[in-house]
Amino acid sequence: MSEENNSQNSNPPNPENGEIASEIQKLQEQAEKFKNDYLYLRAEFENYKRNAIKERSELMKYGGERLVRDLLEVVDNFDRALSVNVSAENFNTFKQGVDMTAQELKSLLQRHNVIEIPAHGAPFDPSVHEALSSEATDQMAPGHIVRVFKKPYKLHDKVIRPGQVVVAKKPE
């Protein structure tokens, strides 16, 4: 009877047990691979974030470098103009040089997408203009700009400086 109990207690080799163990081993290896892949991608993403922050910081710090370099050329021209002793004989040449430098500055601003917004005679627009006062006149339609103290400018499509203007109103 003891032999019967021994044979009943000891399980005969079951082919399913080997398959299950093999399947468990495969799943553990696959889980380890997924974990390693995850850790690698996480580290790669952290590096990406760090680089993106660094690039953004450098862009913020040095983004205007090209504009500044171009502006320095204009500053040099104004410095040369200011060093000239202006007399009646050279006034026209001096004025022409200053006009050319002013045109160079306007051209530079346009190259950098800083655009003057036409104001004189245009309808008043509070998103573009700041009304300093109003003036009674029959020379301009009411609500239109009679005088401009500061021209409005935009960078791309954003107003970066509203114009300071005087708005026409009906004479009384």
UniProtKB/Swiss-Prot annotation:
Top-rank taxon: Bacteria
Main subcellular location of this protein, as a coarse class: cytoplasm
UniProt cross-references to Gene3D superfamilies, sorted A to Z: 3.90.20.20, Head domain of nucleotide exchange factor GrpE
Pfam families listed in its UniProt record: GrpE
Disordered: annotated segments: 1-22
Regions of compositional bias (Low complexity) in chain numbering: 1-11
Bridged cysteine pairs (disulfide): none
Alphabetical UniProt keywords: Chaperone, Cytoplasm, Stress response
HAMAP family: GrpE (MF_01151)
Family in the record: Belongs to the GrpE family.
Role this protein plays: Participates actively in the response to hyperosmotic and heat shock by preventing the aggregation of stress-denatured proteins, in association with DnaK and GrpE. It is the nucleotide exchange factor for DnaK and may function as a thermosensor. Unfolded proteins bind initially to DnaJ; upon interaction with the DnaJ-bound protein, DnaK hydrolyzes its bound ATP, resulting in the formation of a stable complex. GrpE releases ADP from DnaK; ATP binding to DnaK triggers the release of the substrate protein, thus completing the reaction cycle.
Subunit structure comment from the entry: Homodimer.
PANTHER family (UniProt xref): GRPE PROTEIN, GRPE PROTEIN HOMOLOG, MITOCHONDRIAL
Entry protein name: Protein GrpE
